[in-house]
Amino acid sequence: MTIKDIAKLADVSVSTVSRVLNDRPDVSEDSRRRVRAVIEAHRYVPNNSARDLVKIRSDAVGLVVRGVQNPFYTDIIHAIEQKLDTSGYTMVMRQIPSGDDEIQCGAVMEKEKRLRGIIFLGGRSDYSPEEVSLLGVPYVCCSYTNSYGTLPPESYSSVSIADMETAYQATRYLLDNGHRRIAALITCPDDHSISQLRYEGYTKALAEAGIPLDESLVICTGTFNIQDSYTAMNRVLDSGADFSAVFAISDNTAIGAMRALREHGRTVPDGCSVIAIDGIEVSDYIDPPLTTLCQPMEEMGRRSIQILLDMIEGRSGNCHEVLPTVLRPGGSVKTLV
């Protein structure tokens, strides 16, 4: 039996049969029921693989986590797990290094585990339609969006903060506290990621304040790791660069920078002020507590999985949500006279 035979017996189109076989949400319940009845009656095995006969309908949702051991993800993952536990779905998670291709990983998982949908936790912001055509299930970009890519907004879903605006607010906070020589601790200024968006927020705030960009104060770490941030900050401090404050694109990078500053005799905040974005728990317990713009991590996880389940179960289509951040004043920013 072929897909064409199933379509004829179920009185639907071939494309409808294909969507049912791939557990796509954009099929009416009546058509889905008729197609499944034919499949079960004729014991049709998709892809000529016996393993696919075990389940016509999978209850697995994939989670691809890009950037191993990033503490920012902990609360997001917990919120996703909680929602899945109460919704009758199981979670299949893969962690990949930041340099790996999350779309390719998701496509492989989809076929191996017969996923109903995928959440990408962290990823690039420059996808093309050709890239994501590998995916046959709904997906949500969690903590980022496709700012530099060519995907039509209606073709995918995302839950994120306004990265550029949040970085602008952080830099503006330093400016309002009297700082003019402000270093930026980023991964890369042009990597088509949230780092680039936050760098653009930093440069926008400086430009509005009439402060020329000093590229010697743009510190590139290459990653969000504490160790790499510590190393990058040491390099700049050894060069004798002059700055009174640091805008770090994440709490992790700020923590690494603060250790380097301390070891160079520049205590925070008296010797140098530091502000960041994230709000991970540990940053409130370092000395001094970090001043940061907190992302609503649990809400980000809850909304991402709810949007995905709504698409899987046919309740809604693709959408985009931008969540607010909240400034948590710590003890890492000093007001200059």
Label each region the model flagged.
Residues 114-121, 183-186, 219, 240-250, ...:
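Periplasmic-binding protein-like
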Residues 232-337:
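Flexible loop/turn connectors
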Residues 56-172, 176, 238, 242:
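Alpha-helical recognition/docking segments in bacterial nutrient-uptake
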Residues 181, 213-217, 267-273:
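Short acidic capping loops at alpha-helix termini that bridge into adjacent secondary structure
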Residues 1-58, 72, 337:
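N-terminal helix-turn-helix DNA-binding module of bacterial transcription factors
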